[in-house]
């Protein structure tokens, strides 16, 4: 029993330490930019030794990937909890509202995510991370939509929505379009709602 308990405590300690590293790294990334950050910067921010840091993460790419995944999971949990707590029924209207709220969000995670997107063109390692993140996002969409469709739409449908969200996020952060988008939130929401309403019609026709 003590051996098992010790293993669990050690495991939890490692998970907590990795979370601390991610939180510290996020601040460094936002301050210096991802491409300008090296592991020594993370060492200084966390106070860990080289061995201590590399025991948990081998590169800034690994840290960034976990930050992105953690953000995706947290948002999914928040959405699912919101639907459950409010007794909401998932519909094109509700989902379009969630999509637009995500696009208009203004927080450190969004800033880091857009920084990540901007680096993709010049960095093959980050491209590989993006492919993984996109696959996980599509899977999260499928789980969320499993009760809405008789037959789930193709991956291309969800990929289209991810591309729309990414385009909107980059417009808000890089082109300073957030205020303009907020003023036109009603129309943006209607655009997404129309798209998913049509996708559902095709689903009904197949049934």
What are these regions (language model features)?
Residues 58-62, 66, 87, 104, ...:
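Residues in soluble alpha-helical coiled-coils and helical-bundle/repeat scaffolds
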Residues 1-16, 203-207:
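N-terminal intrinsically disordered/low-complexity leader segments
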Residues 91, 104-128, 174-178:
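Amphipathic alpha-helical segments used for helix-helix packing
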Residues 69-75:
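Short, basic, alpha-helical segments at the C-terminal edge of helix-turn-helix-like DNA-binding modules
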Residues 99, 113-117, 165-169:
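Short alpha-helical scaffolding segments that buttress acidic/His motifs in well-ordered protein cores
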Residues 7-9, 20, 24-62, 66:
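Helix-turn-helix
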Residues 66, 80-107, 154-162, 185, ...:
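Hydrophobic alpha-helical connector segments
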Residues 127-131, 135, 147-207:
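Hydrophobic/aromatic-rich alpha-helical bundle segments in the mid-to-C-terminal region
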């Amino acid at each position: 029993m003590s051996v098992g308990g010790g293993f669990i405590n050690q495991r939890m300690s490692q998970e907590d330490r990795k979370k601390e590293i991610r939180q510290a790294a996020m601040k460094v990334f936002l301050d210096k930019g991802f491409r300008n950050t090296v592991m020594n910067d993370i060492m200084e921010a966390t106070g860990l030794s080289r061995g201590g840091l590399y025991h948990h993460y081998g590169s800034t790419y690994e840290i960034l990937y976990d930050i992105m995944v953690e953000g995706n999971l947290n948002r999914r949990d928040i959405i699912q909890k919101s639907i459950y707590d409010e007794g909401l029924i998932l519909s094109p209207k509700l989902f379009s509202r969630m999509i637009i709220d995500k696009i208009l969000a203004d927080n450190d995670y969004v800033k880091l995510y857009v920084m990540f997107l901007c680096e993709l063109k010049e960095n093959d390692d980050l491209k590989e991370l993006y492919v993984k993140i996109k696959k996980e996002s599509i899977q999260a969409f499928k789980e969320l939509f499993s009760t809405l469709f008789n037959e789930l739409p193709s991956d291309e449908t969800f990929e289209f929505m991810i591309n729309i969200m990414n385009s909107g996020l980059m417009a808000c952060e890089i082109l300073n379009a957030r205020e303009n988008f907020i003023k036109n939130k009603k129309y943006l929401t209607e655009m997404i709602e129309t798209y998913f309403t049509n996708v559902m019609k095709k689903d009904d026709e197949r049934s």
